């Protein structure tokens, strides 16, 4: 049976695990949190849900960092939550220190599996985790812009009437305000985006609205209910399933950007194949000149923040 370890049992982390369980991903789930009683309460609650599903062989319990040894997958959701009106990048100082401490403990445990970082800001924190542990880059990833892509597909579906599973395209770059919607590679059903523009089924104003709505939606949700967790829970469960069962599906997730590229040396989202060897970047995913410029600017902006982190924290 697979073994999955979750660090951080707040709303986001436990929603990921619960979604994995309801999807039928059989595993031994181990919950780790600084608040051990809180984690134990979640384990007890979810074990009741497991008991109602006679087809699953899953088990769930609490544990310590030592339990990471032998695990197939580590999901890191620890960190302070995003405050109302706060950008993800404004959380860097606090959560980078937390991530460094976690990474040191995980390295000490002998863990040798795959890691999905979902604590915000995910791009920077995945970089912190990989630098501290020195784990193979392809075995560390972040949830990146997978959720942004889901939101974008939802809004494009609303505008066109085409179901979301027939809307194909990605959001790349920073998981945040400088994300980049790749309209040039978009396909809606069997048609290119240009066909919808030519027929006036979509307008340039529609595309602008979709782009803005995609990155602003998180703030709207946080203003209403203080945090987001169902969307990211579903997204990360999909990633976990692809890694654990070698499905080799393509997702827009945080992967390492080579130092030779503008803003390189950090994790940032591009399309990647996820399977038993970790992530593989999708090759020949060409962008329009404007999209490439926006992506480079997004990477350079993140790199500046990463440089600031390195001034505050020794690696």
From Swiss-Prot:
Record-annotated active site: 175 (proton acceptor)
Q: Which GO terms describe its cellular component?
A: cytoplasm
Biological processes, Gene Ontology terms: glycolytic process; lactate metabolic process
List residues binding NAD(+): 12, 33, 65, 118-120, 143
Q: Which domain of life is it from?
A: Bacteria
Task: Report the pathway entry.
Answer: Fermentation; pyruvate fermentation to lactate; (S)-lactate from pyruvate: step 1/1
First and last residue of the signal peptide? none
Where does this protein reside within or beyond the cell?
Cytoplasm
SUPFAM superfamilies per UniProt: LDH C-terminal domain-like, NAD(P)-binding Rossmann-fold domains
Assigned protein family: Belongs to the LDH/MDH superfamily. LDH family.
Q: Which HAMAP family match?
A: Lactate_dehydrog
Name of the protein in its database record: L-lactate dehydrogenase
Quote the gene name from the UniProt entry: ldh
